[in-house]
């Protein structure tokens, strides 16, 4: 009976601690210009704020005003030019003053904004320590609680930090409390220069250069792939919480894992945390830890069950703290042998194994009560890295649990107004994982919301975390000492690491992308990283393209980095064989961390953000349908850097489009072949030259026509599905440079007795050449099989169809390529009749998702080429996102195929979706 009572007591204590955290979501917002009362009055619970704007936090100021109908959504059309900027100079230049919503004419973004909310604190908070945490603000803040100033803008500064404030003396448990936060603009909002991108193939919009001085998001001032955000994203952009503890608190827990045996049969787990006495008297207590295996992994729309059993690991340690003392407490296998876990369930990257997670709960006990508690998931895994050398070039190689990982993925951006939901975050991570990506980076997300890293953990997406973004500081220029406040920068790095370091998905800490900080910041950052985490490599920069001896000799101790985006390929269209030739050159290609090309969305997306898309008024223009709106949304170019070559290829290969839909459809052919080639070029020399490849970019921060494989609406375009095919662990491909059929096995299991079939099919459907052979392919390698002859006897357009099957005849991989035998001519694709496929489908509701099974058959005597499949809702509108096993299906006469799709019940409006072939 005593044991049962103890268990019940611990359960009650656990629930009490968890129940003490409150998220404050519903707020009121008002410009300080319109608030004449004092701060103490505004933050009093009795204050009347009914006339203020109702907002849901997290939100920036501008996004709140868009939601409330004060300004149009800047992400669509040219709406951004109907919103005044924080820069008066820019407003005058672009005549934006007339759009100011303020009747007094004052700039709406230069002064502070109040965010105010009221919350009834539980009575159980009485006698406890009460903490208010701001998880992300931009840029400075004063915080008031119940008429009292808790902290001011001199200490609450920086976008990439959390702020935990002790509000015990001002909180009123059992009563209504007011929290009021005054948010201030960034210190250096800058002037957008030029800030516009309205000419097709014209100059890029540039930046707001002064913004680089602050610890804030640089793309808020404009970028080649991002519009100028008029308020520079000032606001409370991450959640605000209140929690209660007793006098002994836990902070900065850190779980590290190593695999001391090469066969990974044993894991050594180490747990550490800081324990702090917040009182003015000595405290004696205990620290407890409980580690369990996570068998049911939760996602927003489904739950994934993971097999396995681990007996819960329970650890206890006595701790004694003097008044105000802070102490490091550790649990190690030397003292607690159960932390040596036999036959551990390991976390692997996507495509290399399961993503097993473990859960740890840490508690501080004082007397019979829980003083503080923290819990989170972690993964048992070990990341190591080394360099592969060819001549003077180096490629970085990552190993997870002793197995080398061929890195395939790309870069992402946040929504330009920082608007996100947990579901959208997980949807994006799922799109990446289902595309067979395993590595993701961002130069624009130094402090992502926790859900991003949690989703990467669950989907097996390795993440290298970039501290200082991109091109904020460039050696040898006037920006080299940015950011202005180095102490703030390093403090921000410290909080990033403390916040994220328990995530198994993080494989490297990266100083910045493409550039490098000055020596003082470089050394301070490196020292901070080494003091907080030695389990991961620190890479000071992803790339460098300057005279190191002259400008950054201090960098030499961290060279070579083994990754780069210097030189070509860059970010424009090129023929597929170009990427293969570049890889064969070796130089700057061994771990290519950025390359890309434009990738126009499907027409159904384009028409949503380009209002002129449905017009044919300018059909005779040589650049139809492109106009200033297309330019603003990505159709720019300088020195053939971006969009011009892509557009030229569309018109040269497929003819002049008669509608915007024609243009988007032609673009799908081009993007599919180009993005596939970027990944297959890396595949064709896997490990003997290449160890990784990352595209710029995976997603878009706003509706855009340039670099992406799925668009802002979460609609994948053709480049997504052809990249997905190229990144599959077991893959068959045709090398674009020498027409060799190659089997790529990036898995760690050998392929035994597989069958390769290759055919050349003319456009009249006759088979001009074919080959079949059986072979075995070792683990983690590639094998050339046969060369497709190029003898000039094929029709003007022809196809190469590849299949790889296992011993039982099951399809492992397939691929389809289209070629011209003369000139760059695919006009046939734009004029040929597409036979309708015979289709059937079944829909099954599975918890919170629908699974749709589609069967397709081509009963005609002609090719049915590039069929884009979609699901529609009750109104006939296309549903997104939908997670297709394959898409853009081509079937030759007599062929059939089964494809599966999954979609959230909520995204379908709760109504059974319908299958369509989109036209």
List where the protein language model places each region.
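Extended carbohydrate-recognition surfaces in non-catalytic/accessory domains of CAZymes
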Residues: 20-133, 155, 215-238, 246-248, ...
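Carbohydrate-binding surfaces of carbohydrate-active enzymes
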Residues: 22, 273-280, 367, 620-887, ...
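Accessory beta-strand-rich segments of carbohydrate-active enzymes
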Residues: 28-34, 64, 104-251, 278-279, ...
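N-terminal carbohydrate-binding accessory modules
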Residues: 363-432
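Low-complexity, Pro/Ser/Thr- and charge-rich linker/hinge segments at domain boundaries
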Residues: 200-220, 247-253, 381-399, 821-840, ...
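Bacterial Sec-dependent N-terminal signal peptides
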Residues: 1-21
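Extended acidic/polar, glycine-enriched regions
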Residues: 169-176, 272-389
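Substrate-binding/catalytic cleft of secreted carbohydrate-active enzymes
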Residues: 439-637, 670, 674, 681, ...
